[in-house]
């Protein structure tokens, strides 16, 4: 299977897993055009997986269903997803094109957000980003931290497939919080070179994220110290460390909003 991120909008990725015969699993098609263009080159849509209800992740589905009316769509139970689809949730599993994916509920960015895990791949929508995490639009910091901790416990070789290309803007904040992290410094340099070459910085290994993403390192002494300095007091617990980081990032001069 070939894993390919298709750019959409300014910074979205539509993820595709393509079999040798062209049949493909499509994750979060916010636009139809990238899929239609890929179809002209041999891609055959076989199933759509949706992580959450936001338009930049599901907006292309109606047009794709007009073209392929029997195309199965799998998405969370959410009345805001106005589609004919298979409702799935925590504990479900999907078997598509010989691949098995576990479905886990990762609330925080939205109440019903799902993540798909399988074949050493993690399709996490707007829960986990390269060097960052999604904003908390509907959930709580406690929920979002718990969701991220579930993802952090996966095998370190897992490849993280995020919904947006935010690595460089996230790196600016991460280095502000954790400036002496040499692995983070190296990642920023590598990401900058990749973007200058027109390449995606994703997927990225979970191991790399665990070493460099401040939102996955809330128990690390350096991150705890940085948030204490920012708050001008000692954080109460790890949830407050996380909530402080998220609020800090929301107001950081260089940012992207999913």
UniProtKB/Swiss-Prot annotation:
Keyword terms: Hydrolase, Metal-binding, Zinc
Subunit composition and interactions: Monomer.
CDD domains linked: hydroxyacylglutathione_hydrolase_MBL-fold (cd07723)
Biological process terms in GO annotation: methylglyoxal catabolic process to D-lactate via S-lactoyl-glutathione
Keyword Zinc included in the entry's annotation: yes
Free-text remark on how the cofactor is bound: Binds 2 Zn(2+) ions per subunit.
Binding site for Zn(2+) 1: 52, 54, 109, 126
GO molecular function, one term: hydroxyacylglutathione hydrolase activity
SUPFAM superfamilies per record: Metallo-hydrolase/oxidoreductase
InterPro entries: Clx_II_MBL (IPR035680), Glyoxalase_II_hydrolase (IPR050110), HAGH_C (IPR032282), Hydroxyacylglutathione_Hdrlase (IPR017782), Metallo-B-lactamas (IPR001279), RibonucZ/Hydroxyglut_hydro (IPR036866)
Highest taxon in the source lineage: Bacteria
Chain's role: Thiolesterase that catalyzes the hydrolysis of S-D-lactoyl-glutathione to form glutathione and D-lactic acid.
Entries under Gene3D superfamilies matching the protein: Ribonuclease Z/Hydroxyacylglutathione hydrolase-like
One Pfam family hit: HAGH_C
Native organism: Xylella fastidiosa (strain M12)
Pathway membership: Secondary metabolite metabolism; methylglyoxal degradation; (R)-lactate from methylglyoxal: step 2/2
E.C. numbers: 3.1.2.6
The protein's enzyme class: hydrolase
Family designation: Belongs to the metallo-beta-lactamase superfamily. Glyoxalase II family.
UniProt binding sites for Zn(2+) 2: 56-57, 126, 164
Necessary cofactors: Zn(2+)
Catalysis performed (reactions): an S-(2-hydroxyacyl)glutathione + H2O = a 2-hydroxy carboxylate + glutathione + H(+)
Identification of the protein by name: Hydroxyacylglutathione hydrolase
């Amino acid at each position: 299977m070939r894993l390919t991120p298709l750019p959409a909008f300014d910074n979205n990725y539509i993820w595709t897993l393509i079999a040798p015969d062209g049949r493909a699993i499509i994750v979060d098609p916010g636009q139809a055009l990238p899929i239609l263009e890929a179809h002209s080159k041999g891609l055959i849509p076989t199933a759509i997986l949706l992580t959450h209800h936001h338009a930049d992740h599901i907006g292309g589905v109606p047009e794709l269903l007009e073209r392929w009316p029997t195309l199965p769509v799998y998405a969370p139970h959410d009345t805001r997803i106005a589609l004919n689809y298979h409702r799935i949730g925590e504990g479900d599993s999907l078997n598509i094109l010989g691949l098995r994916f576990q479905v886990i509920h990762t609330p925080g960015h939205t109440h019903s957000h799902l993540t798909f895990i399988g074949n050493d791949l993690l399709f996490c929508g707007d829960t986990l980003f390269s060097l960052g995490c999604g904003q908390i639009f509907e959930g709580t910091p406690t929920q979002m931290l718990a969701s991220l901790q579930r993802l952090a416990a996966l095998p370190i070789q897992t490849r993280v497939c995020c919904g947006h290309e935010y690595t460089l803007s996230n790196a600016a904040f991460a280095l502000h919080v954790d400036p002496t992290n040499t692995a983070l410094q190296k990642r920023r340099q590598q990401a900058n070179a990749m973007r200058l070459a027109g390449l995606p910085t994703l997927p990225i290994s979970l191991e790399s994220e665990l070493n460099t993403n401040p939102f996955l390192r809330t128990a690390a002494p350096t991150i705890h110290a940085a948030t204490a300095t920012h708050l001008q007091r000692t954080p109460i617990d790890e949830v407050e460390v996380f909530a402080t980081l998220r609020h800090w990032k929301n107001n950081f001069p260089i940012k992207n909003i999913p």
